[in-house]
Amino acid sequence: MLKRLSFTAALMTLAASPAFAHLDPETHGSLMAGISHPLFGADHILAMVAVGIWASQIGGRALWAVPAAFVTMMAVGFGLAVAGVELPFVEPAILASVIGLGLLVAAAVRLPVAASAAVVGLFALFHGHAHGGELGAAGALQFGLGFLIATAALHGAGVALGLGVTRLGPAVARILGLATVVGGAAIAFS
């Protein structure tokens, strides 16, 4: 039994190919590369889902306005990067967004909708700029549309998660916020 398991493990190791975090736009197309891009970065996933959870905590118009502000400003940041406009501290700002959004969820901060939209919009500017800087061989319009679709889907998942866990009590969403902070800290120290 052990010999068979060892042989299988060795065979699987030899047959394994390198992992690629993002789809090649030349093989899969720019739209699919854009859609897949935010789905393979823990920082992006944590931030996008946290936006949705925070919007669900605020409720009302924030359910759509806060995620919409993020997507809109992310498109602006992407456009700036494609146009060659540099933003300072892009990666630290993305990391700050993960931790900051996690703290907002953990503390269940209730700002007015416009202020909440401004907060996420500022963070989104840096996320969009990072995506524009990672464009590579992809066509800008298709890639941008793809990552905006994926971002909106992650926001939707966050809103659904936030609304769903509300039934279990407000502490559950706050724990998810704390988990986001821990995830952001883990990324910072990795």
Feature roles, as predicted:
Residues 2-190:
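Membrane metalloprotein/metal-transporter helix-bundle signature
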